[in-house]
Amino acid sequence: MSSQSPSISSEEFAERRRCAAEMAGADGLKGLLICSRGGGTLDRFGDVFYLTNYYTSFPYIPDLAGAWSARAHTFLVLSAKGDCVLVTDAPNDNHTALAEEDVIYTDLVLDGVLEAMRRLGMETGKVGLVGGDVMPVNTYQALDGLLPEVVWPNAQHILVNLRAVKSPDEIALLRRASVVGAQAIEAMMAAAEPGSSHGDVVAAGMAVLAPAGASLYNSFMASGRGGENPQVVRRNFPTWGSKEPLADGQWFRIGLSGVVDGYYFDLSRSKAIGPPTNQQIELFEAAIEIVEAAIAEIRPGVTAETVAQAGLAKQTALGYPNDGVFSGLGHGVGLGWDAPWLAVGDQTVIESGMVLCIERTIRKNGYLGDFEETVVVTEDGCEKITGAQIRYW
């Protein structure tokens, strides 16, 4: 693989903004106000980043009247004519895909939004709101007070639809992220040996991620024993926080996700600590079978629900209840968790160029199996891009 990272061109960012503006106009909107969160979080930065290549690094702090407002949040004001202004609370790092005159840098982010809305003639009428789910209520109330003649219909669907199908350069970035994620999880699985703590395992992964310029998003980690006296060892915060050393006879799983150049990797693996037992292998293999059954259904024209039902049918046939923490079989992936959701009820039609994560965690009698892969949807099926070792038994 080339040492040079793939990237998105300024022309592609401009085309994304053009499409978003056109969709806003088609919905009868004057434009869009797009809000994203930064400040070290990795779960809802994608909408503004998708359109501008900008991420704010400043952490969240409560508003202080006259001094600062809406810190850790970035806003893009985009008119239906295609003009835009980015309002940021951290300096441009020379990667932003906008001209300098189209960026307002200020501690008083809400005042900057007001200035941008007036500059683009959007201080009255219907302006679609994107990212309302990450905007604090007090921020929305303040905006509503500053712009009393604006109506804010939900326009999240515009960015959901744009981000669902990836461009060739996005797919290249997701391939690179998957390579880094695969290398990290293989290092972690190798470190998962008797005597190691969950933290030791994460340290092995970070030794791969940090030099690659990657950020760890989640490392959902658990170990335990099945049988008459089942035991599960895990922590909610951090998700790898257990200090209890791994021991022979335990099962072990990692659900690992992270970000490379803005794009996510997401994968899961399981193994036995010490020699595997038949019961452990049964769960590990069942998780793989369920995921593979869902992957076999992926091709353009089928629905997300159809893919989910294929995996769930295999799970039922194997005798495992659907009682995990996530009832779906997976999701799109890009600058976050994207559409579609591989779940019953999602009628989204699968298209070539989507990138999907397919996942399953199953439990029985105290044993656990966990497996997740990432695929690119092709013209006639899909291609796996995860690349990590699958079986450790």
Provide a role label for each language-model segment:
Residues M1-W393:
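Active-site neighborhoods and metal-handling regions in enzymes and metal-associated proteins
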